[in-house]
A protein has these predicted regions:
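Cyclophilin-type peptidyl-prolyl cis-trans isomerase
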Residues: 101-109
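Catalytic core of Fe(II)/2-oxoglutarate
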Residues: 116, 129-191
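Extracellular/lumenal carbohydrate-interaction signature centered on repeated Trp-anchored short motifs
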Residues: 84, 111-114, 143
Length: 191
């Protein structure tokens, strides 16, 4: 893996993917662009923190992602395999056709996000046209396929964006950061 982008197909149980898609379709908690708290003109998607409303399913999802992180570290950087990481949330998103967040960005650009070592994403459905995750410097586009986990470094070297989907796109996303002792219930030892 020369580009440090780990792609793990069929890594998440398709039944869990279907459950999360149904969950977000039936929810009406946060709709970016219509919510006063997050109203923006540059982002249009529906977001829900899975842990808040369904902690059991969130834990199942995290377990699948952690297995992929173990593989990722063994492939890319085995010398950090003894480190302990936390992933404190699973943000699930629904993006309607031609909507989303299309600006290139990275995951650890300010003091609130600087500890994000790795980003992760799970595609919860297949998208036939558009909707790729595009990495700027790697010149790589990843097509959304249900159950696929993608893991990459959180820094500017892996600036990325979501391209406009032509049909509904569902993802779960989050971050791994080094353990600083405050989130023990979300700790994952990688060795």
């Amino acid at each position: 893996m020369k580009d440090f982008i780990g792609i793990y197909t069929n890594a998440v149980d398709p039944n869990l993917c279907d459950w999360i898609v149904k969950f977000i379709d039936q929810s009406c908690f946060v709709d970016v662009g219509e919510n006063d708290f997050k109203e923006t003109s540059w982002r249009q998607d529906k977001q829900v923190l899975l842990e808040t409303f369904s902690p059991i399913e969130a834990k199942h999802l995290q377990n699948f992602v952690v297995e992929c992180l173990k593989n990722y570290i063994n492939e890319c950087a085995p010398f950090i395999s003894t480190y302990t990481y936390v992933s404190s949330l699973s943000l699930i998103q629904k993006t309607k056709p031609m909507q989303g967040y299309h600006a290139f960005h990275s995951e650890n650009t300010n003091w609130q996000t600087c500890a994000r070592t790795f980003a992760w994403m799970v595609y919860l459905n297949d998208v036939e046209e558009g909707g790729e995750t595009e990495f700027l410097y790697q010149q790589k586009k990843i097509k959304p396929k249900k159950g696929t986990v993608v893991i990459w470094p959180g820094g500017f070297t892996h600036s990325h964006r979501g391209n406009s989907p032509m049909s509904d796109k569902y993802i779960a996303t989050g971050w791994f950061q080094p353990d600083q002792g405050s989130l023990r219930e979300h700790m994952f030892k990688i060795s």
